[in-house]
Amino acid sequence: MIMGMSFVSVWVLNQDSAKEFYTKKLGCALTNDLKLDNGMRWLTVRPQGSTGQELLLMDPAHSMLDGPTAEQVRALVAKGALSPGVMATSDCRGDHAALSALGVEFVQEPAVRPYGVEAVIRDDSGNWFSFTQRHG
């Protein structure tokens, strides 16, 4: 029986740069950085203190995708056309200030929504994530 999600794949353009961004700027914990026999790098992070789902930072060129498909994915990532998901926060405005000071690009400033306060960031590859502080 499925019990939940373990990993969510996030396509990145450069795994070294992504590792730096997610650990140094977003403050995620590095959980794995392994070279597999097939040449793929298994690079995972998750929020500090979390024991749940991890982000698998994947380079399309070193995945199970064929060459042309990997190039299409890279182009979509670089264009900022992909949104891997929503990150939860307890203080959207405070995180906005702290992350902005670290050079994280915000494509949407914190704004009140029916479900909470939301801001949107773009990672160093072009992916965008919603940062959401839910009401109550």
Please give the residue ranges for each predicted region.
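Short Gly/charged-rich anion-binding patches and loops
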Residues: S17-A18, G94
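Vicinal oxygen chelate
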Residues: M1-F7, A29-A88, R93-D124, T132-G136
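Short acidic-aromatic low-complexity motifs
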Residues: V12-D16
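Conserved active-site tyrosine of GNAT-family acetyltransferases
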Residues: A18-T23, L99, G126
